[in-house]
Amino acid sequence: METSNFVKQLSSNNRKTRVNALEALKKYLTAKQFKENKQIEFNKLWKGLYYAMWFSDRPRPQQRLANELGELHGLYFDPKDNSTADELTTNDKAFIKFSRGFWKVMCFEWFNIDRYRLDKYLLLIRRVLFSQLKYLQSRNWDKKLVDEYIKKVLRWLPLSGSPKVYTGIPIHIVDILLDEWERLLKDGDEDDEDEENKEEEMRKIAESAKKTPLADVIAIFQDIVADYNNSKVLREKIKEDLFSDTRLVSWDILEGETQHNDSSNESEEEEEEEWKGF
């Protein structure tokens, strides 16, 4: 696939050109030869998709492209894979490599994104995170797959706590994680104005959330907070905006009062001890 021409076509304002490029991309992604490629080929592909987003310069095409790029993860889902137990399928392995490719490119290119382009990349991250979680859900939250995703995707880079990852990325994940998880669990119906129906929907979401590996994902953030070497800004953001979210309590992911309130004081004490004087 010729990357430069492909990028221009995918970011084109001409609908027909854009649709044709997208269809060609889908065929390329699902070809057996590509799925079995090494990680570097997935990274190269995402570098091209990153620039397709870069050159998309109108609001509606940007939103549409963010949706389309996110939905590419779903191409690797095959219902037949749900009958395969205790091993990752070829599709699962391709999904992991495709997911890693996205986060690698985003984390390493983040410093180059100017303020005029920032919003569309924040939207892209939101759409991609949702689609990655959607794939896991489609695979019935297969434990081996979820563990692989957490270890080789989330903990590997975007939520590694590494100083090489600009804090804007994990902070954005903190902002969107529970909203996207809740969207994943909704039936897809339009918002109902009836208060009783809303309460019933919230009960259903809470019950569904308990059956997901959300606690395993939250554990990543707990580890980040527990490590005082990680960014104080990020740790405070996690405690204030994620751990304090009432949904985690209503979904039985966290207890009402966690020890993270205490760890805030401990964190401050440790950082005071690190002061070297004049």
From Swiss-Prot:
Sequence ranges of Acidic residues compositional bias: 265-278
InterPro entries: RRP1
Keyword Phosphoprotein: yes
Signal peptide extent: none
Record keywords: Acetylation, Coiled coil, Nucleus, Phosphoprotein, rRNA processing
Modified residues (N-acetylmethionine): M1
Function: Required for 27S rRNA processing to 25S and 5.8S.
Protein name listed in UniProt: Ribosomal RNA-processing protein 1
Underlying gene: RRP1
